[in-house]
A protein has these predicted regions:
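N-terminal signal peptide c-region/cleavage motif recognized by signal peptidases
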Residues: 37-40
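Oxyanion-hole/transition-state-stabilizing segment in secreted/luminal serine hydrolases
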Residues: 76-84
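Short catalytic/ligand-binding loop motif for oxyanion handling, primarily in non-cytosolic enzymes
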Residues: 126-130
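Short beta-strand segments at enzyme active-site cores
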Residues: 116-123, 235
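A short alpha/beta connector and helix-capping loop motif
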Residues: 85-111, 116-117
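Short hydrophobic beta-strand that contains or immediately precedes a catalytic carboxylate
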Residues: 72-74
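Active-site-adjacent betaalpha module
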Residues: 2-27, 42-70, 79, 110-114, ...
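Surface-exposed, active-site-proximal loop segments in enzymatic domains
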Residues: 83-92, 133-134, 225
């Protein structure tokens, strides 16, 4: 586990963590991407993310009532979505392929323009989170590279423009004193933060889900919200995931989105639905 000093989001620490991921996970991601590219060259008609030509599952019938709908964006933070972030070596190719950063901007803008409730579920780690006695594989990696590090829950020192901060282009939408900023989740799902409470207190029971990363926090939020009685649509190109030798996180998530979400939409489809008030 890193020492307390590794929790400081200084330039040297960030560069060191980025170099770790660049030399390790980033290289693995490049190999995996190269493999996909080679396969695509041999069979250009195959898109692993394309919808099936003959689906067996029944189509979605979800219709938004914007008075009880919220756009929920998970982890719209620098460490996931910026080339400056420590996870970029693993997720960057997927983020770029799906145009995730720009698509999230479109969703924020559409929701705000149409007075749709917006909530953010962020991911933060404090020095006291570094002493956990057991962790899953991705937890170990996140802590090793210093992902989402903050010095304290009560101090903003070193936070602005750090990997834990929100992406700059989203701040106008998030920091408007209207967006619900839930308390941080710690692993993947919202079970340990106040997102569900905030949604229920605002009489929200329909959720449009987007953010990072697809097979981890987004899928975990999806499952928890469904189990909690919410109707949930996932925006398939407003998320992304790591591509590693262990697997393509985006493809894994997309499969489960199709199986369990109430709807799976593109950003274009979602913007149109968010703009259909009245």
């Amino acid at each position: 586990m890193p020492s307390d000093s590794s929790a400081k989001p200084g330039a040297a620490g960030i560069n060191g963590r980025r170099n770790f991921l660049t030399s390790g996970a980033a290289a693995a991601a490049a190999l995996a991407t190269a493999g996909v590219a080679t396969h695509a060259a041999a069979a250009p008609a195959i898109n692993p993310y394309a919808d099936p030509a003959k689906p067996m599952l029944p189509p979605s019938t979800m219709q938004l009532d914007l008075s009880r709908t919220a756009l929920v964006v998970i982890d719209p933070q620098v460490d996931f979505l910026s080339p400056k972030g420590v996870a970029w070596g693993a997720v960057g190719a997927s983020v770029q392929q799906h145009n995730t950063v720009e698509n999230l901007s479109r969703l924020f803008a559409a929701a705000k323009a149409n007075d749709v409730t917006v909530a953010v579920s962020p991911h933060h780690y404090y020095p006291t989170d570094k002493g956990w006695k057991f962790e899953g594989a991705l937890e170990k990696l996140m802590h090793k590279i210093g992902m989402f590090n903050r010095l304290s829950p009560y101090s903003m020192e070193g936070f602005e423009n750090s990997g834990a901060d929100f992406m700059p282009q989203y701040k106008q939408h998030i920091l408007d004193n209207k967006t619900i900023i839930a308390s941080p989740h710690k692993v993947y799902g919202p079970e340990q933060n106040d997102l569900v409470l905030q949604l229920r207190k605002n009489r929200i029971d329909q959720v449009v889900l987007a953010g990072m990363s697809a097979n981890l926090c987004v899928e975990s939020h999806l499952r928890a919200l469904l189990e909690g009685g919410f109707e949930v649509a996932v925006v398939r190109d407003a998320t992304a995931a790591a591509i590693l030798p262990e697997g393509d996180g985006y493809l894994a998530a997309l499969t489960n989105f199709r199986f369990i979400a109430n709807a799976v939409w593109t950003t274009g489809e979602t913007v149109a639905r968010l703009s259909a008030r009245g």
